[in-house]
Regions:
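Aromatic (Trp/Tyr) and acidic
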Residues: 1-129, 135-137
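Glycine/proline-rich low-complexity spacer/linker segments in large multi-domain proteins
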Residues: 81, 147, 176-178
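Surface-exposed coil/turn segments at beta-strand junctions on protein surfaces, enriched
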Residues: 107, 119-121, 153-155, 165-167
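A generic structural signal for beta-strand entry/edge sites
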Residues: 109-113, 157-159, 169-171
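C-terminal beta-strand-rich structural cap/linker in extracellular carbohydrate-active enzymes
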Residues: 124-127, 162-177
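Solvent-exposed beta-strand/loop surfaces of large extracellular or lumenal domains
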Residues: 136-164
């Protein structure tokens, strides 16, 4: 994970919107071509690069965006781990002795599972980002090892602290309303 000051959920929400609505959308899913630019007009079409006929200079610099996927999924501050993005991944945080696996189909499905594969013998805090569009009234829920936890969170756009002595095999499951 990247060391950070306490992440501001406003910036993480912006990052997530840019990732899904611009960076991922810049690549054609079937053939892999890239857009030269993303038009702002409603209903406008995109033109994707073709390897033999249209490979623009900006396509090369746009490729850099796709290397950013894993950079901000997790961040840490001291011994606190922040889960910023919901992307299938595995984190090995050697300094804290934590190995964590995240499973999700987000944004197609709002279920996110974090599995503790290795944990230190001391209390640690996981800070789970609650997106600005999610809150309990819309069906947001969290369970640890199958037991639903109740939290007072009237709105999204904040981090949910989960502090405990984590053990190998612990599973955190949360559902984001989609």
């Amino acid at each position: 994970p990247n060391q950070t000051n306490e992440p501001d959920p406003n910036y993480v929400n912006y990052y997530e919107r840019a990732l899904y609505n611009h960076i991922l959308a810049s690549q054609e899913p079937d053939k892999g071509g890239f857009v030269y630019f993303t038009p702002m007009r409603p209903g406008h079409y995109r033109v994707y690069s073709q390897p033999e006929t249209s490979m623009w200079c900006c396509v090369g610099s746009g490729l850099e965006n796709h290397t950013k996927y894993g950079e901000f999924i997790y961040a840490y501050r001291k011994d606190t781990l922040y889960v910023n993005l919901f992307i299938p991944s595995q984190l090995t945080w050697k300094e804290q002795g934590i190995i964590l696996t995240q499973e999700t189909r987000f944004p197609d499905d709002g279920k996110v599972t974090l599995r503790i594969d290795e944990a230190p013998k001391k209390k640690r805090t996981l800070m789970i980002r609650i997106p600005e569009w999610a809150n309990q009234s819309k069906g947001y829920s969290v369970s640890i090892n199958g037991k639903r936890k109740m939290f007072v969170m009237a709105k999204g756009n904040q981090y949910l602290p989960l502090s405990r002595k984590w053990e190998k095999g612990d599973v955190i499951t949360f559902h984001l309303p989609m």
